[in-house]
Amino acid sequence: MKNFLLFLLLGISFFSFGKKPDTRYFEMRIYYCHPGRLDALLQRFSNHTTKIFEKHGMTNVGYWIPTNNTDNALYYILAYPSKADRDSSWKHFSSDPEWKTVSKKSEETGKIVAKVTSVFMNATDFSPKIKPSGGAVDQVFELRTYSQLPGRNPAILARFKD
């Protein structure tokens, strides 16, 4: 599962390559919702959470739902200038009065999230610059997992770079 998460950015095919490497610290979070609660989570993110993230210095990179969402999950990626900035942003977000109000109100009919997982990532030097598609066409993204033997990580990175 961790490898699956690690290569999310590699599977997004509509990005264009940038000239400078992206030095931001990325976090992919997966929220697994209680049955019947995914819509409440999506509404909370759409109406409140993404704006509160931005308020605390988090960059919303993207949000995805699996096409076959048997896990009732939301996948999303945030970017921060550094790990220290990430930690500070989450500390301030968690104590934000607006967030506390929104969270409490959205869970009046029951808890929304059953489990959260996170994967922390740094962009490779050949990662494309991330920019939105801006198109009206529905897009499906494929997240591939590549497993390699110990010590072979440089070889797979070279394969994608070259």
Report residues per predicted region.
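Short S/T/G/P-rich N-terminal loop/turn motif that feeds into the first structured element of a domain
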Residues: 14-162
